[in-house]
Amino acid sequence: MKVVLFCGGYGMRMRSGACDDVPKPMAMVGPRPLIWHVMRYYAHFGHTEFILCLGYGAHHIKDFFLNYEETTSNDFVLRGGRTELLSTDISDWTITFAQTGIESPIGERLRRVRHHLDGDEMFLANYADVLTDAPLPEMIDRFAARDAGASMMVVPPQSSFHCVELGEDGLVGGITAVGELPLWENGGYFVLRQEVFDHIPENGDLVADGCAQLAKQGRLVAHQHRGFWKPTDTVKERAALDAAYAQGDRPWAVWERAGVGARA
């Protein structure tokens, strides 16, 4: 199944300076950028056809893959000056690099790569900046068995804030942590059918337009995930993931638990 990755946004909260043009999916976690970790997750489950929706800082993403160094995350033997890899990461990946505009909303980026999805009843999509250990095969199978146009992974609210219940007299009736409320957030992992394109207007958004319309029609399903899920919307969040990687605490690296692929 093909995987569409949205990796053309500015990622302003991740920028370290006025001249920093590195897109958020290229922020490093360990020796590899975020986008690599997301792609390696999908590849672990057999999904190795990727469509990258490029925009801001596209050359960074192109350069990374055009000059990809397998020895960074794989064991190898140096024999007579020649490198013999004992395993590889991306040798079986097919990657389409598609320029989808600098200012384009997510929905418009998806519209602009639709021709790369011709003939695919279902496909996967992702923001390319969120890591998880969610069971992807289960997510796909549950969606395939449903008569729906889209599925989104949802997670409990990540905020550490508390909600305060007020009475008319100004007295506090209760305090509840946001994470304990019966609310769910968009987790950024999607399984989609071609039907979704019928609900995304020009310059529209995947969630606010496409998913919202499907929800009104009862054709949007959710996959609830309470396991590991971490965004990288800020420098602090990215740094926390990088530190966890260095300590060997990387639950999103499902390929490592299987004993194959990238190593520390």
Predicted region positions:
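Well-ordered alpha-helical segments embedded in enzymatic catalytic cores
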Residues: L34-H37, R109-R112, G210
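Structural beta-sheet core signal
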Residues: V3-L5, L52, A125, A150-M153, ...
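Short loop segments at secondary-structure junctions
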Residues: P31-R32, I102, E168-G170, R193-V196
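Catalytic-core segments of class I nucleotidyltransferases/pyrophosphorylases
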Residues: E121-L124, L131-A144, P156-S159, L171-A264
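A structural signal for short hydrophobic beta-strand segments in well-ordered beta-sheet cores
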Residues: M26, C163-L166, A222
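N-terminal glycine-rich phosphate-binding loop and ensuing alpha1 helix
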Residues: M1-Y68, F97
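Conserved beta-loop-beta/alpha segment of the NTase-like Rossmann-fold superfamily
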Residues: I61-G167
